[in-house]
Amino acid sequence: ADLNRYKLVVLPMLFMTKPGFAQKIREYVENGGTVVATYLLGYVDESTLCWLGGFPGDGLREVFGVTASELDTLYPGEGNRAIWVKSSQQSSIKDYCELLQPAEGTEVVAVYGQDFYSGHAAVTHHVFGKGHAYYIGARLDDAGNAAVLRAALADAKVHLRDLPQGVEYHCRESENARYHFYINTTQSAVKVQVESGADLLSGKNVLGSMELKPCDACAIEEKVK
């Protein structure tokens, strides 16, 4: 796939990487792309043979500016916490904790809060070429993952919409219009801020906001000059 089509690429637990994939990621980030990866990145190739030289393998360490030197697998009921360096925000951790060794120039975004690796990097950010590479070394809670993704979206210059919980948003474009789709997946009515235009499902004109009934949807056509 041509990764340059995307402003942001997310690699969750990409344990196996085929030869040549790392080079695609490298070129994508060097050319200005933003990538977010998690623990267990690039451990083996397509034959389940470990990449030699450390993890993440096949040259991905240079892109992310970090080496995963050890993996702590937590028992059910055990946990840790990530502490954000700039805000002191804390997020809970379960299941996996990689011990990360940041390279020179790599920003430590969050550190572990307990155990023998307390104070060591848990989340990192590396500027590589014209782009950005984020590495999440532990299984964070939803708030922790959201904090990393918000930062990555900002670097990728992707506008993040402030939507009610359970509302999905999708956008498609034609030569003369944008089509905004809002889907309420909850069992409650919600009010959402939308673009001014015509709701193609109801046939009504919408000015800035509307209420979506439970399990309801709308498709707003916004004319583009």
Please tell me what each predicted stretch does.
Residues 7:
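Conserved acidic residues
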Residues 12-225:
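A conserved amphipathic helix/loop scaffold
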